[in-house]
């Protein structure tokens, strides 16, 4: 009954209600992800040891590789399932959902094993110094043990939205992230476990988040399935998910890899520069994460409209989403810019690290006003099943454009040039997204 009501929202609710009812829980969930990402750095910052802050800045992009792989099955599964439900193919949607679950388990176990085996090589690659090596090793060793749970939590926070259950999707993230935030000060400061405490809290939060989604399906609350008997790779189940999921995940994967590359390049200028860039990126995350949530929240609605071939409703939903996204990112960018100094000072106490953090954040905020429109367009492409266009946009912003810009500008303007590479990539990738979306729209008319 509850799922039927959710489908009614997709099909018949007023546009504003349909968009906001799906987008707001997703945005709230991403806010919790933001808080979760800030928590480790914040509470480690309270130890007044900026070397530990630098170690977390080095280790976080590596850990985010787990989340990136989870989005292969999460975003890919959401796109395929939402279109299948729009077409009335409920049994096919069940097969896709089960495929996503068991793929997360298998790939998560494999990734955990590889990370633990090659830990020292990974630390050398990310630019850990003699001062940050042990801290980064401790953190990564602990969090790497939670691979399958991280993949499941990140996958199903997306997939459940495909049947209109944005509130349930948000709740799983809320529980896991809230628990992490609660445990961080206890384990870091009260128990005195420092960076190891942060890692343990992260593991527990992901286990609880994944457990919530598993229980949701086992209780029969969903019209979808994670049962092994529904698992299949045939009928374009695997290829359908991967065709959309890999382009989306490549964007996140390249985000992690480019952050690793940024840290290794920034390490030439010292550990405080690494700490500064890590915190500066967290300042801009306050805008980007909310806009990512908005884009992910409207994707199932757009996908349903595509499956139902209701193009008038699709266009109205997209127009409202784009306007709302632009206004939202403008407000968030202004807030972050006005309070950059105060935000950075919460995480960093060293004067040099603070100066790096503020100046780097101001540069990155130059283009954060574009985030809302960019992420809505990317998700609109995914909702249309535009695998090729989605792939091009995602690998451009964090790879094809960003990485060359980082090397070129870094060679000319040193540490400041490294930071300016991201705004350059933001502008060019948005222009590319607009061109590809317009071309895709003309082809479908």
What is the predicted role of each segment?
Residues 1-23, 81-148, 190-246, 302-367, ...:
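Short alpha-helical transmembrane segments in multi-pass integral membrane proteins
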Residues 10-47, 61-76, 80, 84, ...:
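N-terminal transmembrane alpha-helices
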Residues 21-40, 142, 153, 176, ...:
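Transmembrane helical elements of multi-pass membrane transporters/channels
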Residues 31, 35-53, 123-130, 186-193, ...:
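Helix-terminus/linker motif at the lipid-water interface of multi-pass membrane proteins
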Residues 41, 50-53, 90, 119, ...:
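Membrane-helix interface/capping residues of multi-pass secondary transporters
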Residues 53-113, 150-169, 263, 276-340, ...:
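Small-residue-rich hydrophobic transmembrane alpha-helices
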Residues 65, 180-185, 210-214, 286-289, ...:
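Hydrophobic transmembrane alpha-helices of multi-pass small-molecule transporters
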Residues 74, 142-161, 169-177, 198-213, ...:
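Short runs within selected transmembrane alpha-helices of multi-pass transporters and secretion channels
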């Amino acid at each position: 009954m509850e799922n039927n009501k959710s489908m009614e929202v997709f099909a018949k609710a007023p546009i504003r209600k349909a968009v906001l009812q799906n987008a707001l829980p997703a945005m709230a969930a991403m806010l919790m992800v933001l808080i979760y990402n800030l928590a480790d750095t914040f509470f480690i910052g309270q130890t007044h040891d900026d070397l530990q802050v630098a170690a977390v800045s080095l280790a976080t992009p590596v850990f985010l590789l787990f989340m990136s792989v989870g989005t292969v099955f999460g975003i890919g599964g959401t796109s395929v399932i939402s279109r299948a439900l729009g077409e009335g193919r409920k049994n096919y949607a069940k097969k896709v959902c089960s495929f996503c679950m068991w793929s997360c388990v298998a790939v998560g176990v494999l990734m955990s094993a590889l990370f633990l085996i090659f830990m020292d090589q990974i630390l050398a690659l990310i630019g850990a110094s003699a001062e940050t090596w042990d801290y980064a090793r401790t953190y990564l060793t602990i969090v790497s043990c939670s691979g399958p749970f991280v993949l499941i939590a990140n996958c199903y926070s997306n997939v459940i939205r495909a049947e209109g259950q944005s509130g349930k999707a948000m709740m799983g993230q809320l529980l896991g992230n809230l628990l992490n935030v609660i445990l961080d000060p206890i384990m870091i400061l009260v128990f005195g476990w420092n960076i190891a405490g942060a890692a343990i809290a992260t593991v527990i939060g992901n286990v609880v988040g994944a457990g919530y989604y598993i229980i949701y399906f086992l209780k029969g609350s969903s019209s979808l399935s994670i049962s092994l008997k529904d698992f299949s790779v045939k009928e374009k189940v695997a290829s359908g998910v991967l065709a959309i999921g890999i382009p989306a995940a490549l964007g996140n994967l390249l985000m992690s890899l480019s952050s690793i590359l940024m840290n290794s390049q920034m390490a030439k200028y010292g550990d405080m520069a690494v700490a500064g860039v890590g915190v500066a990126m967290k300042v801009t995350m306050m805008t980007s994460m909310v806009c990512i949530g908005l884009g992910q929240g409207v994707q199932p609605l757009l996908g349903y409209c595509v499956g139902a071939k209701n193009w008038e409703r699709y266009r109205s939903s997209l127009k409202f989403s784009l306007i709302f996204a632009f206004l939202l990112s403008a407000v968030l960018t202004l807030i972050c810019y006005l309070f950059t100094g105060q935000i950075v000072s919460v995480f960093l106490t060293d004067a040099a690290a603070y100066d790096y953090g503020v100046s780097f954040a101001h540069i990155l905020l130059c283009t954060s006003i574009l985030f809302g429109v960019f992420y809505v367009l990317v998700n609109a492409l995914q909702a249309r099943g535009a695998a090729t266009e989605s792939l091009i946009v995602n690998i451009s912003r964090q790879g094809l454009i960003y990485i060359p810009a980082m090397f070129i500008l870094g060679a000319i303007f040193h540490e400041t040039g490294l930071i300016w590479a991201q705004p350059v990539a933001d502008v060019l990738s948005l222009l590319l997204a607009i061109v590809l979306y317009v071309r895709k729209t003309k082809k479908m008319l």
